[in-house]
């Protein structure tokens, strides 16, 4: 927003994140804070580097802080930059209110966020094995979503991952498949929803076009008018997603 610039997680190297920000004419020194969802390396790889270099504040819940302490990704960060954002709470950052909510993932206390400003909201929801009815209610009827479409089940099962890792991904503490993500959207989107971004796609176990097609097809079968009432949009860890207004 005009008053606050926030980064959710920093799962890439600091140099890579700096380059991606430049693609949308932003600089890391403009960021006020990083909100951390959980301690897995693909979400905190660049957290420590960015915090030390640019002095930005870091927010996570207490259990996640404990899980991050001592990791090479966090390293030594000034205590004044460390802040608690407990699960199930709402914090105000300048002109935006942010609600945290828990998800089902194999981390200490994973949480994601709903961003609210001027009567509109945007939900980020990835890294969860399933979406419960309670969670669906918490994130319902947002103006926009970033929803996980992590894997295609058949590609994952036929792929080279160890069976134990496949079981983890497919479990209730794993990740949403393309079908799971579409089902979650069918249960949560509302009349105000205009944009659905597909995120956290596995490079090994998914294909961008397949994820997109699965989402659109399942929404269409549920009589939801893709392209008329709302649009489905792709994201990639290799390129910056264009800025958009919600």
Each model region followed by its residue ranges:
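Conserved beta-strand hairpin/beta-sheet module of binuclear metal-dependent hydrolase folds
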Residues: 1-24, 111-127, 144
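Active-site neighborhood of phospho(di)ester-bond hydrolases with catalytic His/Asp-centered motifs
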Residues: 7-11, 32-39, 59-62, 123-127, ...
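Active-site metal-binding motif and surrounding structural segment of the metallo-beta-lactamase
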Residues: 13-61
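Active-site environment of divalent metal-dependent phosphoester hydrolases
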Residues: 40-44, 65-67, 107-108, 131-133, ...
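Metal-dependent catalytic neighborhoods of phosphoester/phosphodiester hydrolases
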Residues: 45-54, 69-72, 206-213
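Metallo-beta-lactamase
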Residues: 62-112, 116-119
């Amino acid at each position: 927003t005009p008053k606050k610039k926030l980064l959710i997680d920093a799962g890439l190297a600091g140099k890579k994140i700096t380059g991606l920000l430049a693609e949308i004419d932003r600089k890391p020194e403009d960021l006020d804070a990083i909100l951390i969802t959980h301690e897995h390396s693909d979400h905190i790889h660049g957290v420590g580097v960015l915090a030390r270099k640019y002095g930005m504040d870091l927010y996570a819940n207490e259990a996640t802080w404990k899980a991050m302490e001592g990791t090479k990704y966090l390293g030594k960060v000034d205590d004044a930059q460390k802040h608690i954002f407990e699960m199930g709470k709402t914090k105000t950052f300048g002109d935006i209110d942010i609600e945290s909510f828990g998800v089902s993932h194999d981390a200490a206390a994973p949480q994601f966020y709903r961003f609210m400003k001027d009567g509109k909201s945007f939900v980020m929801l990835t890294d969860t094995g399933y979406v419960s009815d309670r969670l669906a209610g918490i994130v319902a009827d947002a103006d926009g979503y970033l929803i996980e479409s992590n894997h295609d089940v058949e590609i994952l099962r036929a792929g080279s991952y160890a069976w134990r890792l496949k079981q983890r991904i497919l479990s209730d503490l794993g990740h949403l498949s393309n079908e799971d993500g579409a089902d979650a959207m069918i249960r949560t989107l509302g009349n105000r929803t205009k944009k659905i971004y597909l995120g956290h796609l596995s490079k090994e176990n998914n294909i961008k076009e397949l994820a997109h097609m699965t989402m659109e097809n399942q929404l269409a079968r549920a009589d939801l008018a893709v392209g008329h009432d709302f649009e489905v949009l792709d994201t990639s860890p290799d390129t910056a997603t264009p800025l958009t207004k919600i």
